[in-house]
Design a protein with these regions (language model features):
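Conserved ABC transporter NBD signature motif
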Residues: 79-87, 95
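ABC transporter nucleotide-binding domain
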Residues: 197-285
Length: 329
């Protein structure tokens, strides 16, 4: 798969019959059961190379189980997994060498410095000598670790730890980087800085990122998204496709509750709700063009309005009945 010296498992032949040119990961009819409980129920999806793939679902949806199977932490009951055409059933160690993972809870040794953590991890993957030093230095520069490189990890801020977590996951130059709730527990400004970093890494390295998150605004940035619920895939597509299918734009019309307004909305076949606290109607529209038409038709009724685009939060609510996911899984 790669000529880098820290890929220790040679270059076995892959099954070109299952290789799709622009796919890095293919999951086919995956099943995992725990007794009578089906944690993952015959799911199939693929991840394109160089993409940001979002894997979404509330607690117990099957996300963690699926990731643990992809990374060979758990065995599957049936199904196939291919990474860049290599069958996990035959090349599990090779596939593991091509995946990096940032866990929700940091696995860094808090008593050691970032440089010590990176050197230990690099040694685990067989990096030695000048190549090891060069790879670690590249990560230090790329992720901006220099200013706290020798400070104990336990004394770093949340954002600094996340940078080191990402460096650790990338030390072996993986083709697929899994980010499992990477910004949970971070303040909004730090979350933004982490995502700026991830986007910068994708641009510089061409690496594919597989994301799980309960922050729906992060899923908005994905190339493609899969939504899980109770072990099943209940929707998948680009964020735009999902919003068009499972959400919608809406117009906020401000003013006091007015029966004449409501009669007009009903005559036009509009779905609406009224917010008593903020005194506005929320009228569902198909898209921005429909919003403009609605505003034009009702301009004599309106004192003020606001057009709001449908969001991934709306998609998630409509699919699962849950406004947002709890932290964790």
């Amino acid at each position: 798969m790669s000529s880098n010296p820290f890929h220790l498992f040679g270059s076995p032949s892959r099954n070109d019959s299952v290789v799709v040119k622009d796919e890095i990961l293919s999951v086919q009819h995956l099943v995992k059961k725990y007794g009578d409980l089906t944690a993952v129920n015959d799911i199939s999806f693929s991840v394109k190379k160089k993409s940001l793939f979002a894997f979404l679902g509330q607690n117990g949806a099957g996300k963690s189980t699926t990731i643990n199977i992809i990374t060979s932490i758990l065995s599957k009951d049936s199904g196939k997994i291919y990474l860049d055409g290599y069958d996990q059933d035959h090349y599990s160690d090779l596939i593991k060498s091509e995946i990096g993972i940032v866990f929700q809870n940091s696995v860094l040794d808090p008593l050691l410095s970032p440089i010590d953590n990176l050197e230990i991890r690099a040694g685990f993957y067989g990096l030695r000598g000048a190549f090891k030093k060069e790879r670690i230095q590249k990560l230090i520069d790329m992720l901006g670790l220099q200013s706290f490189l020798k400070r104990p990890v336990g004394k770093l801020s949340g954002g600094q730890k996340r940078r080191v977590d990402i460096a650790r996951a990338m030390v072996h130059d993986p083709k697929l980087l899994i980010l499992d709730e990477p910004t949970t527990g971070l303040d909004p400004q730090t979350r933004i800085s982490v995502w700026n970093l991830v986007n910068d890494l994708r641009e510089k390295t061409g690496m594919t990122v597989f994301l799980t998150t309960h922050y729906m605004e992060e899923a908005e940035k994905a190339t493609y998204a899969v939504v899980m619920d109770k072990g099943n895939i209940i929707a998948q597509g680009t964020p735009t496709q999902l919003k068009n299918q499972y959400s919608g734009d809406y117009v906020l019309v401000y003013g006091k509750n007015n029966e004449d307004w409501e009669n007009q909305f009903l005559l036009q076949g509009r779905k609406f709700t009224y917010n008593h606290d903020s005194n506005y109607y929320r009228i569902l529209v198909k898209n921005s063009i429909d919003a403009i038409d609605f505003i034009d038709r009702n301009k004599n009724l309106l004192t003020d309005f606001e057009v709001v685009k449908g969001s991934m939060d709306d998609v998630f609510l409509n699919l699962t009945g849950v406004r947002n996911m709890e932290e964790g899984k």
